[in-house]
Swiss-Prot record:
Chain segments carrying region Disordered: 98-117
GO terms for cellular component: cytoplasm; plasma membrane
Segments of this protein annotated with the region Domain II: 82-127
Name of this protein: Chromosomal replication initiator protein DnaA
UniProt-annotated stretches for the region Domain III, AAA+ region: 128-344
Gene (UniProt): dnaA
GO molecular function: ATP binding; ATP hydrolysis activity; DNA replication origin binding; lipid binding
CDD domains per the UniProt record, alphabetical: AAA, Bac_DnaA_C
Length: 464
């Protein structure tokens, strides 16, 4: 039985699983083969339980494929494999998320190597982490499940799980909440951890002040000696060449010290214009996860949780009514609920659907005006560079059929029209055709990064 057995399994799993799943759950595993037993070591209990629940059959199936009746037994452990039994996990260059680290990268230094600790005073760190944003009050749904799971692992194992962690998605979807949740999680495990949260513009402002005050070395020392650096809206580095230069070196210093970096953006790293390619490449060294607009069930759960936090009884049918009509992001949902609560407090009236219609009259009218089937068809046609007439035609080529399915799925998601009504609007198609289109797009969003990106981009455009 070859020691490359786990490497063979990794290669097959990489082919069979979506890239994000492989990076998040399979790549962190370490393997040890001994006495006809393959031990897989997970970095924490959360990963172990998830892998055993979701991928046990896949792994056992591969072991049987490769070894037949001689397949080893499978055992799961939390921790690291014994140092004496080193089994390389590198499958291909594409599996590795970053170039090989220097041999000296073994432990996070308390200060950068160039810092003269005896000559420099102890730095004072401003955390800026909001204690109100935790994992406990983050509402999990299909749209953000992977992002939350990755953030949770980083909080449990900073510098070791996914570094850097890059979260991207539209405005108001929970990226900032997760940044703060990670910061709070790290500090809960280690009270004296040096965790710094900031908007990217603050980094730029600090650098400018340091240059003006001839204090650039102190600036470098400050940012390169944190345990975790959490930067929001990294896209604001665009076209700021001096800031990008300094962040490039800060990024490298932190990574070499096993210090955690988490970044957020409103778009995929490679799509950030005005940012150097060498930075965009580094953004993807660890794990990149999208946060999509919340689906209906998650929107309802967010409203119910927010109401509960405010000691407000929100009937389920009212939460469903609001969630069905406001779809773009969490911030919009919470803002609408705050308005409903304020109106109820001022008037003393019960929160009913009729009351919500009145309290959110202008917001609901604007939403219905913005998102119509006609508007969806025009937006999708423009996005895919085809004609609206193509969407309504009988043509079945993929270049037309896929955009048509996308438009139907968006119509179901963003409007209150029934399936037959949507079918009529697409050239008199049957409601079963619309249902098939919706299911197909949902399936492709799980399997294809491009379709997932297209759906998110179109939702963002139509909801803005």
């Amino acid at each position: 039985m070859s020691l490359s057995l786990w490497q063979q399994c990794l290669a097959r799993l990489q082919d069979e699983l979506p890239a994000t799943e492989f990076s998040m759950w399979i790549r962190p595993l370490q393997a040890e083969l001994s006495d006809n037993t393959l031990a897989l070591y997970a970095p924490n209990r959360f990963v172990l339980d998830w892998v055993r629940d979701k991928y046990l059959n896949n792994i056992n199936g591969l072991l049987n494929d490769f070894c037949g009746t001689d397949a080893p037994l499978l055992r799961f452990e939390v921790g690291s494999k014994p140092i004496t039994q080193v089994i390389s996990q590198t499958v291909t260059a594409s599996v590795s998320s970053a170039p090989a680290a220097p041999a000296a990268r073994t432990a996070a230094p308390s200060r950068p190597s160039w810092d003269n600790a005896a000559a420099q005073p102890e730095l004072s760190y401003r955390s800026n982490v909001n204690p109100k944003h935790t994992f406990d009050n983050f509402v999990e749904g299909k749209s953000n499940q992977l992002a939350r799971a990755a953030a949770r692992q980083v909080a449990d194992n900073p510098g070791g799980a996914y570094n850097p962690l890059f979260l991207y998605g539209g405005t108001g979807l929970g990226k900032t909440h997760l940044l703060h949740a990670v910061g709070n999680g790290i500090m809960a495990r280690k009270a004296n951890a040096k965790v710094v949260y900031m908007h990217s513009e603050r980094f730029v402002q600090d650098m400018v002040k340091a240059l003006q005050n001839n204090a650039i070395e102190e600036f470098k020392r400050y940012y390169r000696s944190v345990d975790a650096l959490l930067i929001d809206d990294i896209q604001f580095f665009a076209n700021k060449e001096r800031s990008q230069e300094e962040f490039f070196h800060t990024f490298n210093a932190l990574l070499e010290g096993n210090q955690q970096i988490i970044l957020t953006s409103d778009r995929y790293p490679k799509e950030i214009n005005g940012v150097e390619d060498r930075l965009k490449s580094r953004f993807g060294w660890g794990l990149t996860v999208a946060i999509e607009p919340p689906e209906l069930e998650t929107r309802v759960a967010i409203l119910m949780k927010k109401a509960d936090e405010n000691d407000i009884r929100l009937p389920g049918e009212v939460a469903f009514f609001i969630a069905k009509r406001l779809r773009s992001n969490v911030r919009e949902l919470e803002g609408a609920l705050n308005r409903v609560i304020a109106n109820a407090n001022f008037t003393g009236r019960a929160i009913t659907i009729d009351f919500v219609r009145e309290a959110l009259r202008d917001l609901l009218a604007l939403q219905e005006k913005l998102v119509t089937i006609d508007n969806i068809q025009k937006t999708v046609a423009e996005y895919y560079k085809i004609k609206v007439a193509d969407l309504l035609s009988k043509r079945r080529s993929r270049s037309v059929a896929r955009p048509r399915q996308m438009a139907m799925a968006l119509a179901k998601e963003l409007t209150n029209h029934s399936l037959p009504e949507i079918g009529d609007a697409f050239g008199g198609r049957d409601h079963t055709t619309v249902l098939h289109a919706c299911r197909k797009i949902e399936q492709l969003r799980e399997e294809s990064h491009d379709i997932k990106e297209d759906f998110s981009n179109l939702i963002r455009t139509l909801s803005s």
